[in-house]
Structure formats: structure tokens, C-alpha cells
């Protein structure tokens, strides 16, 4: 029973190390993007949610100021 626990624990740790190495490799590949189109897509992904969040905050205030029905 004890040896089974040790081997399962070893497999678990080896699996987590393998996952972390794969994630680091994936991150390194994402950093190596040199094409401007791919870089623009990444910029859009970062800024579109920010713009949408700001619009969601300010649109009700602007609508309230225009219609004066607050």
C-alpha cells in the first residue's frame, strides 16, 4: 500500500512538472510572434474588453444626462 502511494505521488509530481514545462513552452511560442497581424490580434484581445467595460460604465450616465430621466 505504501509503495503504491509513493508511485502515485511520483506520477502526480512528474505530471505537474510536465504540464508546467508545456505551459512555459507555449508562452515562449506566443512571445516569439513576429508577424504584425498576430500582434494586432493580441492587442485587440487586450483592449476590446477594456473599451467595452468603459462603455458599459459611461453609457448609462450619458443617456441619463441627455434624457434627464435619472
From Swiss-Prot:
Its tissue distribution reads: Expressed by the skin glands.
Q: Which residues form the propeptide?
A: 23-44
InterPro entries in the record: Antimicrobial_frog_1 (IPR012520), Frog_antimicrobial_propeptide (IPR004275)
Primary localization class, coarse: secreted
What keywords sit in the KW lines?
A: Amphibian defense peptide, Antibiotic, Antimicrobial, Cleavage on pair of basic residues, Disulfide bond, Fungicide, Secreted, Signal
Q: Does the keyword Signal apply?
A: yes
Question: Might you name a Gene Ontology BP term for this protein?
Answer: killing of cells of another organism
GO cellular component annotations, sorted alphabetically?
extracellular region
Top-rank lineage group of the source organism? Eukaryota
Q: Where is the signal peptide?
A: 1-22
- Compartments (UniProt record): Secreted
What the record says about family reads: Belongs to the frog skin active peptide (FSAP) family. Brevinin subfamily.
Briefly, what is this protein's role? Answer: Antimicrobial activity against the Gram-negative bacterium E.coli, the Gram-positive bacterium S.aureus and the yeast C.albicans.
The identity of this protein, by name, is Brevinin-1PLb
Amino acid at each position: 500500500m505504501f509503495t503504491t502511494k509513493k508511485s502515485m505521488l511520483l506520477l502526480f509530481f512528474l505530471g505537474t512538472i510536465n504540464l508546467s514545462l508545456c505551459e512555459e513552452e507555449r508562452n515562449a511560442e506566443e512571445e516569439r510572434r513576429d508577424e504584425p497581424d498576430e500582434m494586432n490580434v493580441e492587442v485587440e484581445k487586450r483592449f476590446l474588453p477594456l473599451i467595452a467595460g468603459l462603455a458599459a460604465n459611461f453609457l448609462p450616465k450619458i443617456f441619463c444626462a441627455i434624457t434627464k430621466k435619472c
